[in-house]
Amino acid sequence: RRAHEDSIRTAYVKTVPDSAETAAFCQSHGLDFAAVRPLMAKACGNWQALEQTLCAYPEQKTIATLRTLSDKDLRDFSPAVLADHLTATPDAPAAFSAAARTLYYKYVSCPRIANELLTPWRSFFAKNISKKEAARFRAAPADMADKVRRLPIDTLWNPQGYCESPASAFTFGITDRKGKALLFVAMARSLGIPARIDEVTGKVQYL
């Protein structure tokens, strides 16, 4: 039985591109092998999704965004979800310093907020936040925080504490406290405002 299990595991591992295969892929698509190889190793069985994403969008932006994801996210992400985040997020301004670019990719372009299911919320907010309101929120993020804060809190329909998607919370106008935090950060990032949920305190923060 153990030998059979080992054979299944070995067969699976062999499906993941090795260093030589990754180098060939990078060469054929003009990609930086040194940047792609670690991502490919972490993606494991999700390597086809990774290759699809790398081929479809600008290299620097795509790799920088992929680097913000955890190893588990790289093994699980859907190309359709990443497509939403890559196409609906502007490139980091050329004048940004290296430190500013790191902050931008980590707290603006990153699809991951907390422990929620990764969902395609950027294009949703681009369509559902008016240009007038977007300009107001960019000028005064506290106004956006106040809008989210005023939403009714649901204490009845989610006893298991599942994470509601930001788009769903926005659509229905009611969510729990965690949902409010996710909603604010998603709205902020979709408007180019760096935001996060502090991992220690659980408080929402923006710059």
Model-found features: residue ranges?
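N-terminal accessory/pre-domain segments preceding catalytic cores
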Residues: 1-153, 166-169, 179, 189-190, ...
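N-terminal export/assembly leaders
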Residues: 152-161
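Conserved helix-adjacent loop modules within structured domains
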Residues: 156-157, 170-174
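A generic short-segment signal for beta-strand/edge and adjacent turn/coil regions
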Residues: 163-165, 172-175
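A conserved hydrophobic secondary-structure block that centers on an alpha-helix together
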Residues: 173-182, 187
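An acidic- and aromatic-residue-enriched active-site/binding cleft used to recognize and process polar
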Residues: 174, 193, 200-203
